Regions:
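Charged, low-complexity intrinsically disordered regions
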Residues: 3-67, 71-186
């Protein structure tokens, strides 16, 4: 069983995926409009819970709302969506947050911007390296002052990781300066 199969095997509630697919598709279309990216031609549905196996256990802090999309290339294409809010709701809060305390919006209780920026960079780097270790290759990086999108792929799927910033959003130039270095590792 390869990485994509392991992801999908974690969610067996096909009916629930069907019921949520239209809402997720609308969300996704809106995000692509905001990010000025071309939508993938083959999108449908997949689960909600699966990126846990891809995430490195290293992060001690998550100060953003992280959302992951997995797009499968197949005759009946699927995509998988998971976010920190959903993870918290299904009972894996400690896995994502470490020892940090989060409010209802999954924002860490700190106002030290320098510290916050270092944590974001660290979380992104650990995620990136964990996914590369699972067989994903980088496509590109896209960012604004409020969000950053990391895109990776395998022969079977494409994965996008979105980090949504709120009150601690650093300038995009600084985000790009740190995160673009990740691609030099491969």
């Amino acid at each position: 069983m390869d990485f994509v199969d392991r992801l999908l095997s974690l969610d067996t509630d096909y009916r629930n995926r069907l019921e949520t697919s239209q809402w997720i598709a609308r969300e996704y279309a809106g995000r692509y409009t905001r990010y000025r990216m071309r939508p993938h031609a083959d999108l449908a549905i997949a689960g909600q819970r699966a990126l846990i196996s891809a995430w490195s256990h290293g992060p001690e802090h998550i100060i953003t709302e992280a959302t992951f999309w997995l797009f499968l290339r197949s005759p009946n294409p699927h995509y998988l969506h998971i976010s920190t809010r959903r993870i918290r709701q299904i009972g894996t809060r400690r896995f994502m947050t470490g020892n940090s305390e989060f409010d209802e919006n999954c924002l860490v209780h700190t106002r030290d911007e320098g510290h916050a920026r270092r944590l974001v960079n660290s979380d992104l780097q650990r995620t990136f390296l964990a996914l590369c270790g699972a067989g994903f290759k980088p496509d590109g990086l896209l960012g604004t002052s409020a969000a950053i999108t990391l895109s990776l792929h395998t022969d079977r799927a494409r994965l996008e990781c979105h980090w949504y910033r709120s009150d601690l959003a650093p300038p995009y130039a600084e985000f790009h300066r740190h995160t673009s270095r990740l691609f030099e590792l491969l």
